[in-house]
Amino acid sequence: MKSIVVIEDDAITRALLQQSLRRDGWRVLEAEDGETGLNLVVENRPAAVLCDLHIPRRNGFQVCRMLRAQPDLAGTKIIVTTGSRFGNDRLTALEAGADDYLVKPVLPADLTRVLPNVAADPAPNGQVATPPTANDAIELTNTGLFKTSFPDDSDLRTVVRFWGVRGSLPTPGPTTVRTGGNTSCVEFRCGDQIIILDAGTGIRGLGSSLAKEFRGRDLHLTILISHTHWDHIQGFPFFGPAYSPTNRLRILGYESAVGGLRTALFEQMETAYFPISLSQMAGRVVFEELEDMRFQIGPVAVQSVFSNHPGICLAYRLTTPGGVVVYMCDHEVYLRQERLTQERAGKPNAAAIEFARREDEKIARFIGPADVLICDSQYDEEEYPSRLGWGHTCMDDTVALALAAGVKRLCLFHHDPDHDDAKIDSMVAHAKELVTKSGKSLEVDAAREGQEIVLKAVKR
């Protein structure tokens, strides 16, 4: 009997795929994460693999590359099944070794089309396939050593400060002075714990501030990277504390669609682009590539989810004794993207609309009744159609998402380079009108450089 490994973390999708495949005579082996899936493939040598892109513990791009690095598995067909409509993701998956790319929801006819002539499982040829390992030569720290609970005496303030609020590229000048022109960087503190969300150009000013505050003292902090697009890492070479030998920096993030976290930061500091290499930074810089979707940083419990953005991009939910802050910097709401895509193609698909709606509901559940939501709001309704599939959200959808999730305070974030202070003010005014029409309660403002939000711990 032909066997197939299905690597999918969504239980509903996994069950539907299993039902369809078994009806067609397949022996189905299931995995909820990439690491388990890789082991199943090595142990069972299936005829085919169905793999989502957005899975924990080795994303789908990694799975494709690792399987294709195994000569003994050359006959195994790899089919990516994903909710991502982004053209770059399709191209990257095929370059990583996928044989086909199916956008969810995957129907039985889709499976029949891509699996018509797959032979029975490859016969052993005397070689033993070994478990794949990452080809990026980085020694990773064991991230399982994080604490898993708050301290009993949880009397800690949570402070959020914005140092960079712009998307895509820096936009300095007199027309952006009130909002700010630096790219993504948010300082997050809980007690003595310092977490920096992304390393856009705003991190330079934050570094100068920290250097003054900690003059004569060692500085220990964590930089949490959402993804490695330029506007989220371009400020790191200018982060002053990284050049002090007494400071320790932990840089956390997930492997991207094309390589490791350290590699991405290293390459932008190569000689062709920057005069100082990463190895010349005197600070103790430790890279930790995350695999699990839940982890702990001191007293801060962190949960992550894949956002709808080209490549691998994560949103973070940070829970402290003072409350919950969600950082979703780059995200395109699924339903509007799907509706407009279908409208342009002239091909209505009710199943795809329902799938998009369900994906948006999953994101809303992840956000939950957060105290603060920092969320992508790059376009207005007129701009969005010409930027369909760029991985950013229409502000109206951001407000709707916050209302559905029961958020207390929404900070519009990742402002478009073409949006000056006046434009952003008008978007805030429109957002408040939407809240009023909904009849619900939600505080809305634009994230602005220098702005500070304080959440005080509730004593029990």
Regions flagged by a language model, labelled:
Residues 15-23:
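Charged docking surfaces used in two-component/phosphorelay signaling
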Residues 56, 74, 86, 104, ...:
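The feature encodes the CheY-like receiver
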Residues 106-115:
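C-terminal output helix
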Residues 335-442:
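Cap/insert and terminal regions of metallo-dependent hydrolase folds
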